[in-house]
Amino acid sequence: MSQAIGILELTSIAKGMEAGDAMLKSANVNLLVSKTICPGKFLLMLGGDVGAVQQAIATGTSLAGDMLVDSLVLPNIHASVLPAISGLNSVDKRQAVGIVETWSVAACICAADRAVKASNVTLVRVHMAFGIGGKCYMVVAGDVSDVNNAVTVASESAGEKGLLVYRSVIPRPHESMWRQMVEG
């Protein structure tokens, strides 16, 4: 079976912990992330076979009720997405940069996955709602045309749920901004 990740984002920390427990009991999945995020929300990320992740997310979504911010089941995740969440994927030289900012972690991760599958870009980072008011953003680097395409695809993905905050393409970033965006 294919591997997948599932994400559940809630407005309540207590409800998030309750949902996480129920999700893990409902299906054979691995807990990848369970933590508070700004502003007082709770994030759960699970991994496993597609069917198991779908079952766990369905359980969590049902339990979350009106405290659900967003959810996602992402089968066959691109290999660069999880490293970009954990830290940074390295980029050798200064290139065009694209940034897509969303209102939810799930929307951003889905957008990042679609962008790197549709374009020849490096997914440099995915910053997940810590210290930025609960928003999430992704940074891609590459040739201008590829970055434009990636940002368009990612923006359309986040926009489908009404969760796009803003998008930007910087064709020739200043060296200081480049370092900030790709080195953290």
UniProtKB/Swiss-Prot annotation:
Record-level GO cellular component terms: bacterial microcompartment
SMART domains hit by this protein: BMC
One MF term in the entry's GO annotations: 4 iron, 4 sulfur cluster binding
Compartment(s) where it occurs, according to its Swiss-Prot or TrEMBL record: Bacterial microcompartment
Record keyword Transcription regulation present: no
Applied uses, from the record: Artificial BMCs can be made in E.coli by expressing pduA-pduB/B'-pduJ-pduK-pduN-pduU-pduT (in this order); pduT and pduU are optional, while pduA, pduB/B', pduJ, pduK and pduN are essential. A construct with the reversed gene order does not make BMCs.
Pathway named in the protein's UniProt entry: Polyol metabolism; 1,2-propanediol degradation
Required cofactor(s): [4Fe-4S] cluster
BP term (GO), one: propanediol catabolic process
Domain BMC: 4-86, 96-182
Principal localisation: other
Subunit note: Homotrimerizes to form a pseudohexamer with a large central pore, which is probably the binding site for the [4Fe-4S] center. Interacts with PduS. Originally suggested to be a homotetramer; this is incorrect.
Protein family (similarity comment): Belongs to the bacterial microcompartments protein family.
Name by which UniProt lists this protein: Bacterial microcompartment shell protein PduT
Species: Citrobacter freundii
